[in-house]
């Protein structure tokens, strides 16, 4: 049975109460009741993002986010979308430097469906992953890069700024979208190895918030996720340390056919978790 503890908001604060649990396979589960509306939200957060990618395989975390919607052993094709939307829910996924997450918002009585769907693809997506899915989503992601970065005014500005702010070899040197060359180079076996390493219960946090019965919800989580094996092969991410001061101004001028001039600037702020960082957050 899962073990857990409760974190309670201070009396009179108006805050919510959350309980945290951990399954035997390492999956962390956070539950929070909010009965204002008959809706429940599920978010499955995997501790893998673009900072965990290796040189020559940038964009793999984001590509795999797309592959997660291509069908699993029991829910083929677009079945995940169709089942959630057919039940009156909504869904999506996002990828960042640090993490990848998947989420559904469902009518309360359809919560079990969302939990089963997330557990199904965590546990059985590998069996359905094939070359057709890989090529399909590779093209989708490459087209997304063209639409959002390569073929729009100022589209590559943030990508250039990131590469300038973080030196070669730093895990933040590239953005989650990845390069065209690396997207072309990614193989089906790369995707399978990525899944085996990172899409494991001991590398994830499942949160369920809304009009829920915590005891019943936890029972469903144990029922659907409890038998998925953990995986201990994940390598630690590359060192993300940087000196406190850059020591110089780093500048790049780009000349392109765009409607007007634009300036994008970034500043090195104090380390996260310090009083100075908190002050900077308030100031900015």
Where do the PLM segments sit?
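Non-catalytic beta-strand/loop surface segments
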Residues: 2-50, 74-110, 148-203, 227-273
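Non-catalytic, conformational "gating/processing" segments within enzyme and secreted inhibitor domains
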Residues: 131, 138, 188, 192-224
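M16/insulysin-pitrilysin zinc metalloprotease superfamily fold
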Residues: 70-71, 105-137
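Acidic/histidine-enriched alpha-helical segments
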Residues: 125-145, 213, 232-248
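Short pre-active-site segment immediately N-terminal to the catalytic Zn-binding motif
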Residues: 48-58
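Short, intrinsically disordered, charge-balanced linker/junction segments flanking boundaries
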Residues: 275-284
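Bacterial peptidoglycan biogenesis and beta-lactam-recognition machinery
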Residues: 69-73, 125, 213-215, 225-231
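Active-site SXXK
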Residues: 58-72
């Amino acid at each position: 049975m899962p073990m857990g503890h409760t974190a309670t908001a201070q009396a009179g604060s108006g805050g919510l109460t959350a309980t945290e649990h951990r399954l035997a396979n390492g999956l962390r589960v956070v539950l929070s009741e909010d009965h204002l509306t008959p809706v429940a939200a599920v978010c499955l957060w995997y501790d893998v993002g673009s900072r965990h990618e290796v040189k020559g395989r940038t964009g793999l975390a984001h590509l795999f986010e797309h592959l997660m919607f291509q069908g699993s052993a029991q829910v083929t094709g677009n079945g995940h979308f169709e089942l959630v939307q057919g039940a009156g829910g909504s869904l999506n996924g996002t990828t960042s430097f640090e993490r990848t997450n998947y989420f559904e918002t469902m009518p309360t009585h359809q919560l079990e469906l969302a939990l089963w769907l997330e557990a199904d693809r965590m546990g059985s997506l590998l069996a359905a992953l094939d070359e057709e899915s890989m090529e399909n989503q590779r093209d989708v992601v490459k087209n997304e890069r063209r639409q959002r970065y390569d073929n729009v005014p100022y589209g590559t500005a943030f990508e250039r700024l990131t590469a300038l702010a973080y030196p070669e070899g730093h895990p933040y040197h590239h953005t989650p979208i990845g390069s065209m060359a690396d997207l072309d180079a990614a193989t089906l076996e790369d995707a399978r190895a990525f899944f085996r390493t990172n899409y494991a219960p001991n590398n994830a946090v499942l949160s369920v918030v809304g009009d829920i019965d915590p005891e019943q919800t936890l029972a469903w989580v144990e029922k659907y996720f409890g038998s998925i094996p953990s995986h201990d092969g994940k390598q630690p991410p590359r060192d993300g340390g940087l000196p406190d001061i850059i020591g110089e101004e780093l500048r790049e001028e780009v000349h392109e056919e765009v409607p007007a001039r634009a300036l994008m600037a970034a500043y090195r702020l104090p380390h996260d978790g310090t009083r100075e960082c908190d002050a900077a957050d308030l100031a900015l």
